[in-house]
Amino acid sequence: MTESDALAQVANLPGVPDAVDDARTAVDRLLGHRILRRRSAEVSTEAALRGARASAALEGSPVTLEELRGMESPADPVVHGALRVSAELGTLTETWRKAPRQVLARLHVLAAADAVDGAELGRPRTSDQPVQDALDLGEPPSPAEAARRLELLSNLLTAPTQAPALVVAAIVHGELLSLRPFGWGGGIVARAALRLTLV
């Protein structure tokens, strides 16, 4: 770890290494499960569907898995956006490592396509845009501050680090939730970025 590796410094804070080890142990147990290995495609599809449903629920859309499975095309823009994001995540992993801001813009386009004006899709918010705050996180940073911190986050993500992916993913998720760089769908984007960081 170098002094300039800020993510590794966070990974070495008290309690973090133990939490990472506990998470790895739990994941290793799942990876060792015979049935999960044998039916990995089916499990991946189900996990993506459940992830999209959970993301929509956190944004205030209480759709059940049964309802989601029965829908041809969801009318709720939150549910539809979460499903679109989940479906496209696999195609964004390589770009995420090189150009995270580009991927964040794409994730916002997918998440918010049915909810915001086309001119706002994929673009960070401006001073005159309201911010949807389903988690009641309080006042977001100003657009200028959000843009500055988004640039810093992008620089951290494209720099080499010794930090475990779990720590990097937690930082990405927390910072994007805090910044709410887009006026709508920020939670969906933050959770998708977390998943991309773990891949």
Where are these regions (language model features)?
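FIC/Doc superfamily catalytic core
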Residues: 1-199
